[in-house]
Every structure is written in C-alpha cells, then in structure tokens.
Amino acid sequence: MSDNTKMIRVRSKIYPRQIYFRGARRNSVASFAAFLVPLAAALLSSRTAQALPSFAQQTGKPCAQCHTVAYGPALTSYGRQFKLNGYVWGDVGGSVPLAMMVQGGFTYTSKDQVDAPAPHFATNDNLSVDQVSGFFGGRITAHSGAFVQVTYSGEDRHTSWDNLDIRYARSASIGNDSVVFGLSVNNNPTVQDLWNSTPGWGFPYITSALAPTPAAGPVIAGGFAQLVLGASAYAMVDDHLYLEAGAYRGLSNRWLSRLGAGADSNPNMDGLSPYWRADWQMDFGASYFSVGTYGLNTKLRPDPLSAMEDRFNDLAFDATYQYTSDAGHALAANFNVIHEKQSLDASFAAGNSASSTDHLNTVTLDVTYAYQQTWVTTIGLFDTSGSTDMGLYAPAPVSGSLSGSPDSRGYVLLLEYIPFGKLDSFARPWLNLRVGIEYTGYQRFNGAGANYDGFGRSASDNNTLFGFFWFAL
C-alpha cells in the first residue's frame, strides 16, 4: 500500500476523532516555545485576549449565548447567526481579538497497544497535554471577520496551522425575502458549516489522541483537514433556506511544510474539488430543527508522477434538533449519514487496492442533555461499513484488519461538569473550564468483534476511558 493511500485511510476518521488538530507528526520542543512565547506576550499585553471569549467580549454576550453547553463547538441559533454574518456582530473597540485553549487528560484502554501510540508515551495509561491553541477570532472590517487557530500538539510535539475560516458577509432584501450572503475561505470541508451534525464540528468534541481508532472513513470526514484551501459562496434566505457552493484545491509541498502540516501529508489533490451544501431550518417555540445535505467530489493522484487518479464522491444527509427550556433544561440531537463512492483506478493499477471500485457508508447519532449549562451527558452511536478490500485494509497488530473489512461500530458515553464559562460564572468571559469522563466502546473494529487484526486482538480491547480537562482563556 502506498504512503498516500495509507494517509487517506488513517486521517479520515468518522468517530471518534480529535477535531482541533490533524497535523503531521513531528518532534520539536523548540516549535512549542516559538509558538507559546509570542502568544503569551500578546495575551498579557491585551486586556481583550480571552477564550473564544474574544467573540464574547466583542458581542458583549456570554459564551453561553452562542453555545448550547456554556462554551465549545456546539452552536445555538444565535451562534449560527453570528458565524453566518461573518463574526462581525458587536464592537471590537480597536483591540486585537486573541484567545487561547488548553486540552489534556488521562487515557486508559482495555488492553495495552503493541507499540506506544506516540514517542515519549507508554502503550497504556498515558497522561498528556493534548493541545495548546492560539486563536484570532473576531471582526476585521464592518463586513468581514475570521476564526484562525494555530495548535501545538502535545503528542506530536509540533506546531501547525489548524482551523481557518475567513468570511465576508452582507445582508439585503430581495422582493419580500431577506437574504444574508457571503464568502468563506477555509482549510477543511465542513469547518465553515453552521451545524454540529457535519464532520468539521461534530461530536465527540474532544477525544484522546493516544487511543486506537478505526482505519476507515470518508475523505470528507477530516481527510483533507489543514491540507487544502477552498472558497465557497453562501446565502441564507429568510432564515430558513441555506445554500452554499465552492471548491477546494490541494496545497503544495512547500506550503504544507511552511504551515506545519508536512509535505509527507500531501494527498496530491488533482485540480479543484467541488463542494456543496443545502439546509432547511426553522424555530418553533423553544425548539429548533434543521435538515440538509452536503457533498464533495475529489480526484487524487496516489503517485504524483502518474496521470492515473483515484476518485472519491461523497454524498451526505444530516439533521439537527435542539430544545431549551426556561427551567435550565437543554436537549440537542445530531444525525449524519455519508455515502462515499470510490473509483480506485490508480491504486488498483499499482497493486494498492484489491478492487478498482469500493464504497464506504457511515452513520452517526448523538444526543446531549444539559442542566443549567453545568452538568452535561451525551451518548453517541457510530457505524462504518463498506467494501472488503485486502489491499486497503490488511492484517497488522492493532490497526489492521484480518478480513480486509472496514466495518466498525460502537458508542461514546460522556459526562461533563462545567464550573466556569456560564452566564453567571466567576470572571466571565475570561475563565472557561470543563472537565469530563468519556468512554468509547467498540462492538466491531476493522471488520470483526474478535481477532479483528489477525493477531488476537478483540474490538473491546480498544475500549477507552478518557478523563479530560478543557480550559479556555
């Protein structure tokens, strides 16, 4: 199997995954220092440098106004409107909107891994600082704003660019319809999305980077994160109908190296990859509902010196439901299904796949209940199935498949406590903290429940308990 084919399979995680950092693995303490020193100086010199509390200070609203659970990726209707309108609401007052975030925790798996998941770590029972991120988040001009993230990975010990979403937005009346329209420049298909049902900002919002994860997932589910640059035009009509269309292009080895992603992570995207999104949303009383579709068509060259291509056509459908009561109860549910058609002419000709035509299907569902934005519990279900292919999915300890099947199925159970980051919290909006315990269980892993890898490992051996903290300033 070629390195490029491996990269696409490994980087395309549906669930679980870590959404904030997907850079290539490096080992550099110096890069951490180079990142932290100017960031700390900026934070200390600016009274407005806060969590993406920088958004909270700009708008004059608490983080909980935009986020369903005090703070984090999950957005309320207000949060979606703030993003839709280009991150410009409020008065930034001429200050620089900086923020920072730290995530870490303890990872325990049911059975030790054969090899350590990263340098400087053990095969089990690992304590880690997973991410230290710096942000620019807020208004640039009256009609443009940005969300820019740079992350140091505690596992890789390397700094890289992370999520990027730069927007320009305007509003207008066309006949009897009100329209918000705009442009987004971003570096990951679905990172610009307004909903938490799509891969870019979907559950789980935090996972261990040191635990085993299934080998297969559609390329739209993180396969191109921080490896491409794209632009899309969008419009929201009457706050109901959302339409978006755009395209992505791969970055050169030179730029990937400069940005910290690494030239060895290049998926070798051939030409432009079109992306589309459509969604219908509505509020009714204390409830909110949306249903939509999105997709991506892309061509890759596993061997950049060859004209032969692999094609990936992803088509997805998603839905979101939210309910909030005056008594402090909140409920949210997200559903997502992706079908990927794979035409692997280049990989098949090179002997890296057993078939020239494969497919993958993924289904995810998560339901969250929160009380007073303090106690939060979530259950998530995930299922991946697809074509058996001994070329793509070969036997190997822990990460391999004896049957050549990508099928994986399981659940995520999450319990969180949020002492800071709410409407009435101490030092709002500067101080934000959530702590939690997350358990990931596997019923199938890479094709089977028992001896899935050909070396005696069971799917349940990868069950993971992750105790974490998530701090934003």
What do these predicted ranges mean?
Residues M1-S28:
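N-terminal secretory signal peptides that target proteins for export/translocation
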Residues K61-A70:
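The canonical Cys-X-X-Cys-His
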Residues P62, L413-P419, A459-L473:
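Outer-membrane beta-barrel "beta-signal"
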Residues A74-T76, L98-T109, F121-N253, D270-A286, ...:
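Outer membrane beta-barrel
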Residues G105-K111, T151-R157, S173, N188-Q192, ...:
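Sequence/structural signature of outer-membrane beta-barrel proteins
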Residues A286-G421, F426:
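Detector for outer-membrane/organellar transmembrane beta-barrel domains
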